[in-house]
Amino acid sequence: MNVYEAMATQRAVRRLRPDPIPVPVIERIFQAAAWAPTGGNVQPFRMVAVTDRDKLATLGALYSKQWDSYTSGMRAEGEQLAIPRRKMMEAGDYLCQHFHTLPLVVVFCFNANHMAITDADLDRPSVVGGGSVYTAVQNLMLAARAEGVGCVLTTLLCFEESAVKDLLEIPDPWGTCAHIPMGYPVLGGYGPTSRRPVSKMLYQNTWQTPADFG
């Protein structure tokens, strides 16, 4: 599978089987994450691979609490909820119910002290630091796609960071920024993604000027 096919079919896969992922596959996926570019090549991230059943159950309980809060508005819409959002919610419910059976959850950690955060003083939320972590997250997810392993990027456990850090013995000043459930898909899992056309996302030279490379 080439990288373009992997990117074009990288759906969020929340319905995951408990079957173990072979060690060579896991090693290739984590190697891909470690290859990611980071600011100054400092690599200010670490990954905690969670496989312990008790820890997975605890993470699942924490995640389910936040998922219920996140989806409360959608549930209130009942039959009026749009079908794509209903499907997403149902898949998320499945993930919550089976979190303790997952073969692997990857917790991405970062150390802001090792980042050159060039937008820290701007009058808006800072995002530059994430550029030295989420590149690794995307590499990991693309590698998982290439290996046929399902996964989904989640961040709700950031609301439970203190409990997660205690559970996994993550020291200060490290924080968490992504939690990736992984496993082989229950159903087809991957397939063509649905996104805005690039013509709606790309400008040339000035804002809202349509790009024309002809």
Q: What are the language-model segments listed below?
A:
Residues E5-A6, V13, C177-G214:
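C-terminal helix-cap and adjacent tail motif
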Residues R28-I29, A33, V106-F108, A112-L167:
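Small-aliphatic-rich amphipathic alpha-helix that forms the alpha element of a beta-alpha
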Residues A34-N41:
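Glycine-rich phosphate/pyrophosphate-binding beta-alpha loops
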Residues D68-G78, L167-P192:
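A glycine-rich helix N-cap at a beta->alpha junction
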